[in-house]
């Protein structure tokens, strides 16, 4: 696979995904302003991984948050989610070269937001007496997203899927951190949740552009197997945030009611 031309946005995306140092993941160089002319399709199979990150096939479950250790473990998982999201936004810049340049530029902006969120989490992990690398992580997003065949499938899974579910997860974890007496940690969750709305709105806008609408079945069938709506929602749905992010009420009703065919009572 031919590497992108130096000094281009595509090269920045390539280098970010491929980087193997923690510093390069947390503080990449400024994004160039020049796009490559007629870029080819490039699908990187896996990201570079700093030695600090210990990748496992099955992540440890987030359990009690009453201890600093438990909250640090949870935040470490969230930081790795943000890293994968940043990498996959950069990955998509390379994987969908024929997509509108406005769309690809938006992916870069979101990647930079995710990197900033990583810094927020890293600071909180340090406050709790831990560091990046103290806990194992799983590249779960990377196990799923690269199978997206086109930009519509990508935003269905990322913007309207994982990032949408984070509207619920950040709300839930903010409450749990607050219950544990960690007001600072709760506020960070709330901040990231508020900023996630724009990312979901970006996904909704471009899914409508690519597929001509935002109905539930069109979205569900765009998800790459084996992903399903079950993984793309928290309980209860944060309807107000999702509405602000461009998800209409009929979509939310269908998402709330959906269950796999093989569940009892379905």
Features from the language model and the residues they span:
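Non-heme di-metal
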Residues: 1-266
